[in-house]
């Protein structure tokens, strides 16, 4: 009893740790703009790694029991497949109704190697998905509700056989089949017309391999696109290889979707820039002449005001500017001294100088008193 209790507790502990981590980082993923499908893939990858390592026994006990049942039913199913093979080829293909209530979904397999496919009902798993309020990515992530089970998941059995587990879109069954080269296709057609069905149709099937169909009773769904026009359903089968005449396009009677109306083109509005009745150039010339006259009058007024305000000060001509001083020092016969008195009679000048220095003919002379005459 202790061993069984221990084996039941360890998988629950690992499962609770995974659930807690995924729930804690969900808000961080959403804040960073990462889709929730990435989070579900991370959870699935984590569980697959733990299951493949075989570190925890009984981590996927329900799946392992189902796999054992699949292995036991391989031989009887093969005989039953050969018995009903021709009967299935004679039945016409059926399309999915508007309210999908199918209980069995079969995946087409190769005709040469008729690998058995066993459908195992799953009554314990509950599908909690609101298809009307979820995006395509969120819907695809919600389809992988069972822990460790994705739309296409590889599971290694105790006998070393590699199987694939497929979760059906209606959440009622598992489909187990041996490892084959298949391609997962998921098509979500959100084109809803008024009066049609209210829930979007979600189709999740496997692309057919070259060959026939799987000899198993039930509804056979080929990879196709389902478009709703009014209350009718239009089914367009799609195949991987080149279509044959037998695979012609099947269309149901109904109203066709209205084509997009071309945008109404408005007549271009052309503004007249120049013409026979245009007199804008003459008006512009008149305005420019008036503007020039106004500028001249303003300049004259400003000049008169400046003349009244900025009058030259008295004795301005007697002031010696810097330029004149520079020219004085550049000349020859320079005298620098003090003076006692200066006499002037018309153009004759008489100087009484003292304590100075003079430069005459390139020579300097120092004096204490000097008298000189000049005319200019």
Swiss-Prot record:
Question: Which InterPro entries would you find in this protein's record?
Answer: TFIIA_asu/bsu (IPR004855), TFIIA_b-brl (IPR009088)
Q: What is its main location?
A: nucleus
Per the UniProt entry, what species is this protein from, by scientific name?
Answer: Pongo abelii
Q: For the region Disordered, what residue ranges are annotated?
A: 69-107, 246-265, 274-329
Keywords from the UniProt entry: Acetylation, Nucleus, Phosphoprotein, Transcription, Transcription regulation
**Subcellular location, in the record's words?**
Nucleus
- Name by which UniProt lists this protein: Transcription initiation factor IIA subunit 1
Q: Which PANTHER family match?
A: TRANSCRIPTION INITIATION FACTOR IIA SUBUNIT 1 (PTHR12694:SF7)
